């Protein structure tokens, strides 16, 4: 299968700790890199991950709280020091361009590349990025400020040609694309060769969903249905349910309920409150609801 990986750069929340970096992730789809959130220290973690800076062209910011975007200026500046010339696209809720432009003009006025901002409405689902391989769609969340998650959906690939059968029936090269896309082949004698004899199915397309920060929000279950991997914030244990509601965050058990109801394959929980020196309590509570749960941790790489 083609590469589809999630790299956890940081999984902490607002208050810094010595255990975790602030929230940031990188999706690697066929060696194209897409960053999700860019907390403080993200570029250091990107270095540790051994991912190539030059392959990162799109950054998706969920909301404008500092623990999700304070790393942007440092990363943008470093790209300049590395001699970057390719455009950098930053997708975010309204307001980020207004905040960063004065700092870019002051600290990074000699950049040899363009930083292009794309704003989206967090209140509705919309496609914010698309290429031949993938779409990125927003997931409306509910936090103290406008916030959304992101659904990375691989596009279905054409069927694979069975070379021996194509050679046996002497299929012309110009017919191969049609056959890959599901057409039968008709021989010069008029015999219909079923597509199933000439091809085998491609691997099913994969999906990754990122949901942070949000209060418990069952409305997102339908959009998350059947995803291969779900990252959902789990800031608090169930004993802090009132605090979770007050701050518009989620407990580990609530994150697991979302995963269970959506029928996802695997759940990763993160965005841990600094109060937990040992997050095993969060894993225990989530696993009791959805057994296939793991804890996020720095430098973790998950293959879909």
Curated annotation (Swiss-Prot):
Keywords: Endonuclease, Hydrolase, Metal-binding, Nuclease, tRNA processing, Zinc. InterPro entries: Metallo-B-lactamas, RibonucZ/Hydroxyglut_hydro, RNase_Z/BN. The keyword Metal-binding applies. It comes from the Bacteria. It catalyses: Endonucleolytic cleavage of RNA, removing extra 3' nucleotides from tRNA precursor, generating 3' termini of tRNAs. A 3'-hydroxy group is left at the tRNA terminus and a 5'-phosphoryl group is left at the trailer molecule. Zn(2+) 2 binds at residues 67-68, 213, 271. Its EC number is 3.1.26.11. Belongs to the RNase Z family. Homodimer. This is Ribonuclease Z.
């Amino acid at each position: 299968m083609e590469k589809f990986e999630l790299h956890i750069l940081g999984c902490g929340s607002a208050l810094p700790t010595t255990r975790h970096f602030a929230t940031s992730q990188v999706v690697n789809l066929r060696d194209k890199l897409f960053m999700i959130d860019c907390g403080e220290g993200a570029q250091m973690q990107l270095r540790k991950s051994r991912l190539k800076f030059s392959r990162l062209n799109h950054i998706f910011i969920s909301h404008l709280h500092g623990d999700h975007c304070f790393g942007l200026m440092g990363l943008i500046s470093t790209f300049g020091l590395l001699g970057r010339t390719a455009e950098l696209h930053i997708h975010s809720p309204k307001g980020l361009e207004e905040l960063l432009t004065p700092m870019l003009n002051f600290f990074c006025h000699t950049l040899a590349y363009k930083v292009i901002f794309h704003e989206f409405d967090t209140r509705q689902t919309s496609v914010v990025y698309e290429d031949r391989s993938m779409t990125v769609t927003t997931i409306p969340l509910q936090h103290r400020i406008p916030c959304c998650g992101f659904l990375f959906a691989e596009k279905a690939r054409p069927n694979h040609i069975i070379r021996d059968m194509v050679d046996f029936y002497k299929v012309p090269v110009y017919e191969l694309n049609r056959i890959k896309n599901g057409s039968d082949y008709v021989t010069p004698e008029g015999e219909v060769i079923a597509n199933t004899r000439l091809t085998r199915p491609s691997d099913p397309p994969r999906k990754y969903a990122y949901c942070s920060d949000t209060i418990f929000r069952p409305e997102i279950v339908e959009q998350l249905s059947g995803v291969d991997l779900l990252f959902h914030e789990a800031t608090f244990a169930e004993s802090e349910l009132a605090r979770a509601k007050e701050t518009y965050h989620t407990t580990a058990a609530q994150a697991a309920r979302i995963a269970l109801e959506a029928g996802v394959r695997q759940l990763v929980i993160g965005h841990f409150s600094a109060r937990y020196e040992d997050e095993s309590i969060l894993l225990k509570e989530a696993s009791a609801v959805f057994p296939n749960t793991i804890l996020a941790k720095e430098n973790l790489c998950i293959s879909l």
